[in-house]
Amino acid sequence: ETMPSFKHSLILSSLKDSYILGFDHWYKRYYSFYHPHDECLKEHMSTRAIEILKHIYGEGKFSTNYDLHLPVDVEDKIKEFIGDTRIVIINPLGAKKICRLTFEQIKVIYQEVKTHFENYRIIFTGLPQDLLTIPILEIETLPFDEFIYTVALTKYSDFVISVDTALVHIAAAYHKPTLAFYPNSRTPEYPSHLIWSPNHHKSIQIVSPTYTVKDIDTETLTNSVKRLSCIDKK
């Protein structure tokens, strides 16, 4: 759903590879082979990986499971940070405006988590400057700035609540029970909430009735947190 970019064109035209497989119709002329998979896409984006593997190896069964590498020192720091505590991650403010919960919604989710996840440690993740704006006293955040530490925290967490699809898919890589809030798609021709859905059986996906997550009502928020608490709770 991105518009063509001259800068992107320059990057593609400067590639020295002898063969380029591409999916974006805006840049057809820069590819050795254009694949129409993404045209009128109505299924999860992971199916694109299958098409790439088919193109290279021919027909067959392929795994599209996520595989994330973590540096040992990063994992060690996170394990020391969390100790033997049980963790619920809340990621309430995404990079896009349409993926940012209101402060009232954040408070509702936070209170519900405290109610249904007693004795769990609640850690907020996101951009440091965004987390500073949340009007909840003494919320806990990571003491590390690099995103790789959030990835490691996700690996060692117990539950994840997120508006950020990147974190949703990281949680899926580690098979973490996840509550994911999505804006509705702007057009039926590109059902983004389906294409970029959690793609994991331990995930609960809540799709807003509008193009922004701020319109998800309080009852839906509270019920969804309650549902999350029933998944693999220790």
Map each language-model feature to its residues.
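Catalytic machinery of carbohydrate-active enzymes
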Residues: 1-234
